[in-house]
Every structure is written in structure tokens, then in C-alpha cells.
UniProtKB/Swiss-Prot annotation:
Residues 171-219, 296-305 have a biased composition (Basic and acidic residues). Its cofactor is Zn(2+). The keyword Iron-sulfur does not apply. The keyword Cell wall biogenesis/degradation does not apply. PANTHER family: C2H2 ZINC FINGER CGI-62-RELATED, ZINC FINGER C2HC DOMAIN-CONTAINING PROTEIN 1A. This is Zinc finger C2HC domain-containing protein CBG14627.
Length: 322
């Protein structure tokens, strides 16, 4: 190959049309003739790219077809970069004005207007703006929601509650008026009387007489209740206690004397009748005997202690002598 002359003429292959030197064209023709007779399927690079990736074969095939339509070149997306750049510059300048106003104490500038991109699509139902891909999803959903709200589809449970099927309830003040009118009507019915000629005549109510009668009835009831309460005897039931009499020398007795008294003496007996002498003497003798026995035991214990101490002292003195 190094000895080949660059000025040597080349000849095209009659099968594939490529050009070769005369020496290599003979070798190429035999190989190219064999390949032309074979019918191999063309290699699809889209399937190889689709394996092990998030892309689908249909999306890759669609891109290849678009590329073939445009002469092997992908169409560049039309972007409104100039408009976006202008919006960005306006936002930066407005923020600088706010910072300057905060530092100097000047009044704050008005907020910048939010510019909607020109390629956005406005929804005719909610008047919001979306890009083309989002508008395709949003507009059908928004249309369905608005038709559902405007149609006023009532649920099956509320069909019975229509204006024709139920009577509207009265308001708060109307209910009070109806109650007062019904009461007045019942009172008027009671006071109506029939005359001799058959005509109905209503008797006039005297409010002052009614008030006096009610007061009298209340006074009589209160008097009856107070009289009954005074006439009741004091009982020892649960929750009530009889009034205790004043303390007198005769009532100040010992516990032993109170035990010998009758079980349920009345208040008059306690005040008038003194306690029997026999019981007092017996109780006094009992109390005296009890106190004398206690003093005897104390004296005996003291004497025993003294005698024991004396014996101990004698034993100690003898042990010292011997």
C-alpha cells in the first residue's frame, strides 16, 4: 500500500458504485457480488437503543420517521427565549428597586406584573394558563367539573327534599308568634259565653283580680306549710336532730348515771325529774372502788421496788466487806 502511486487511476464497482484501484477492484467485485445475492434484513438501531432504557421502541421509531421526513435533520423546537430573557431582567431590576427602597427609606415600588408566556394556552373555564402539554390534560377535566357544578345533579338521598314534597319550617320569630296566638286563642275560647239571644259574647278579663287571687292562694299555701312544720314533732330519723335543752347541773351526770336512765326519756323528764339517788350512789361506789384498787396496786408496786433495792444494797455492802 505504501508503494501505491497516488496518481493511479481508480475504477467504479459495477455493483455498489464505489471506486477502487484496478488491483483491488478485482478482489472487491467477487465479494460484492456474493453480498448482493444475500437478502439480509437491515439492522434496526432503534430496538438496540430501546433495550435497557426508559424509552419505548414506538417513541424511537416516531423520532426516526420525523428525521427522515425532514431530510435527516431533527426540527429544532421553537422557543421564545427572548421573551423569557426580558421577563428575567424585569424581575431582577424590580428586586434591586426594593432593596434600594429598604436601605434609603423611600416608598416601596409597585409589585411587577406577572407576564404570561405567549405560548401558553388559557383555559376557557377557569381562566388559568398552561403550556400545550398541560392544557391537553387540564381542559377536559375542567370542562367536566364545570358541567357537573352547573348541571346541579342532586343525589338520590336528597330527591325527596324538594319544595313540593315538604313544608318549609317557620323561623324563630314566626314560631313565637304562632305560640302566642294559639295561647291567646285558647284563653279567648274559655272566656266566651253565649247570651240569651244566641249570640256569643266575650267576657272581659280583669287582670288585677287574677293577680290578687293568685297572691292570696300563695299566702294561704305558705301559712299552711309553716303551720304544719311547727306542729310536727321532732323525730330521730336520718337527717333530722331534735333541739338540745340548755345545760343544767342536774343534766351534767356521769356516763354511768346516764346508762341507768330509761332508754328514750323526753325533754320534759330530763329537765324536771332528777336522777334517782340509788343509781348515783351505786355509780359513786363503783367509781370509788375502782380508784381505790388502782391506788393499792400502785402502792404495792412501790413497796416491792423499795424492798428489792434495799436487798440489793445489802448484798453489795457484804461483798465489799468480804
Amino acid at each position: 500500500m505504501d508503494n501505491a502511486d497516488p496518481n493511479e487511476p481508480v475504477y467504479p464497482c459495477p455493483i455498489c458504485g464505489r471506486k477502487f484501484v484496478k488491483s483491488s477492484l478485482e478482489k472487491h467485485e467477487s465479494a460484492c457480488r456474493k453480498l448482493a445475492t444475500l437478502h439480509r434484513k437491515p439492522f434496526d438501531s432503534g430496538k438496540q437503543r430501546a433495550n435497557g432504557s426508559d424509552l419505548t421502541y414506538a417513541a424511537i421509531k416516531k423520532a426516526q420517521n420525523e428525521k427522515a421526513k425532514n431530510g435527516g435533520v431533527f426540527p429544532r423546537p421553537q422557543t421564545n427565549w427572548r421573551e423569557r430573557h426580558g421577563n428575567f431582567i424585569d424581575a431582577v431590576s424590580s428586586s434591586k428597586r426594593v432593596d434600594y427602597a429598604l436601605k434609603t427609606g423611600a416608598p416601596l415600588p409597585p409589585p411587577p406584573k406577572t407576564a404570561v408566556p405567549s405560548d401558553y394556552v388559557q383555559c376557557e373555564y377557569c381562566s388559568r394558563n398552561f403550556n400545550a402539554a398541560a392544557a391537553e390534560r387540564h381542559i377536559p377535566f375542567c370542562r367536566e367539573q364545570t358541567t357537573r357544578k352547573q348541571g346541579g345533579k342532586s343525589s338520590a338521598g336528597n330527591r325527596g327534599l324538594t319544595s313540593n314534597n315538604y313544608r318549609s319550617l317557620p323561623s324563630k320569630h314566626e314560631g313565637r308568634k304562632q305560640e302566642s296566638s294559639s295561647r291567646n286563642g285558647s284563653a279567648e275560647r274559655k272566656t266566651t259565653t253565649r247570651g240569651r239571644d244566641g249570640s256569643l259574647s266575650r267576657a272581659r278579663r280583669d287582670d288585677s283580680n287574677d293577680l290578687t287571687n293568685r297572691r292570696k292562694s300563695l299566702e294561704t299555701r305558705s301559712q299552711l306549710t309553716t303551720g304544719q312544720a311547727n306542729n310536727r314533732t321532732t323525730s330521730l330519723s336520718a337527717g333530722t336532730r331534735p333541739a338540745l335543752p340548755p345545760m343544767t347541773p342536774s343534766s351534767k351526770r356521769s356516763s354511768s348515771a346516764k346508762r341507768d336512765l330509761p332508754p328514750n326519756p323526753t325533754t320534759h323528764q330530763r329537765l324536771k325529774t332528777p336522777a334517782p339517788k340509788t343509781t348515783t350512789t351505786a355509780s359513786a361506789s363503783r367509781s370509788g372502788s375502782g380508784s381505790s384498787s388502782r391506788t393499792r396496786t400502785r402502792d404495792e408496786s412501790r413497796e416491792s421496788r423499795l424492798s428489792q433495792a434495799k436487798s440489793n444494797s445489802r448484798n453489795n455492802s457484804r461483798s465489799r466487806i468480804f
